[in-house]
Amino acid sequence: MAAVALALPLAACGDAAPRDNVVVAASGAPAGLDFTTTGGAAAPQALVGNVYETLVRIDASGAPVPHLAERVERDGGTFTFHLRDGVTFANGKPFTADDAAFSIHYVQNEWTNGLKAQMDPVTGVEVVNERTLRVTVEGGTAAEDAWLWSMGTLTGAMMTPAGVDKLATAPLGTGPYTVKRFDVGEAIEFDAREDYWGGDVARDGLIRYFDDPVSAVNALRVGDADVVWGMQAPQLIDTLPEDIRVEVGTTNGEVLLSMNNTRAPFDDPNVRRAVAYAVDRAAVNEVVYNGLATDTGGAPVPPTDPWYPGRDFYPFDPDKARELLAGRTPEITITVPNRPYAQEASELLYSQLRDVGFRVRLETVEFPAVWLNQVLKGHDYQASLVAHVEPRDVPMLFGNPDYYLGYDNAVVRERIAAGDMAGAVEQIMDDAAALTLANAPNIVLYAPGVSGLDPNVVTDSL
């Protein structure tokens, strides 16, 4: 949020009372602020970069560059981080190599978020001195590269022992903001730090969460918001006044049709393959995203990742789907979060899957709380549909048999451990472990005179 520039007085585009903060309208509110204990993109999107910072950050090209570490030296699998001087946490405590070491160990030993696996290659952490940290990573060049990249994401969030007891209510980091108020399902209010090491932070911040895109757009129209981030209804673009600027970027978001690999009928790979051939992904893109999404060929990899396969694994082929079902008419329930994209896509899935022989029931659940508890944590579902927007999340999704997909393939785990992500993706797609319907676009709307956010989502932060 600190990057948002306001060339005009706030509320200049409407009749709202003048404000001295930056207001971002978003969807998908976090159920809590502690992203160390559970998956989900909303909490890190709000906190990483705003409250928490990382030793390296990921630039617009997808490369890790120095951040809290002003310099990174690499000798094979040994990384030496030289930390910036003058960086402090919001409580005034200086940021040191001890804090960096603590943060890495905390991921390894205390996190329950599946992304903690990104820290598995670390075999040694040494505090050389107050401003120098040395980390040893094993697994070969690919694994080492992947680890360094992950250190620019939520996994690399730098914390302090004094802050971990209040991760859910008062997160403490080195970033430009502190959390002033968290209203579950409604908003996160931020205070700008006057002592931020990176320079002046001009305005306080507020992220407001809206259940529907029309309400978010209306807030922008009347001056109650400055930016709509990740607008979920592309069809509204043509209705906007000319002075509202629209940018469309790419994301890490795989709109994933998940199939519980441990529960019938999806414990049969041929049934999963039948689903993959039965779904017309191009139709989903047109109806849900006005054609603005990117088709990944069904693979759970955005085009910006180095191992993007760039081919169609499951072309739309209803006859092939019927052949794989071999006369069976499986009864399935798709548990659908109450998000606009998911609701619209599920209606298409309903008709497409019924056309090849599935008996389909749609079950709508509240997102995030109910979906997280029932599907992600409870694994109480047959099929579901959600946008997974965590960056480079193939290991989390498909490398852990205890994850909600229930996908268990030792070959895939070996390839992930060896850094052979392309090979892992090939096997995942051969098994039809899940189907990516689209790589979701990021639609950003700006009020007049507002700019500064990059619409291309490279990591997990806003």
Locate predicted features.
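N-terminal lobe/hinge region of extracytoplasmic solute-binding protein
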Residues: 26-76, 105, 172-173
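Gly/Pro-rich hinge or "lid" segments in bacterial periplasmic/extracellular proteins
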Residues: 149-200
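Extracytoplasmic/peripheral linker and loop segments enriched in polar/acidic and small residues
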Residues: 14, 359-370, 396-448, 454, ...
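Surface-exposed binding/hinge segments that line
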Residues: 73, 78-80, 117-159, 180-181
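Structural transition elements
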Residues: 290-324, 339-344
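Periplasmic-binding protein-like
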Residues: 262-304, 344-345, 424-433
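Ligand-site clamp/hinge motif
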Residues: 193-238, 359
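Periplasmic binding protein-like
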Residues: 24-25, 92, 351-402, 421
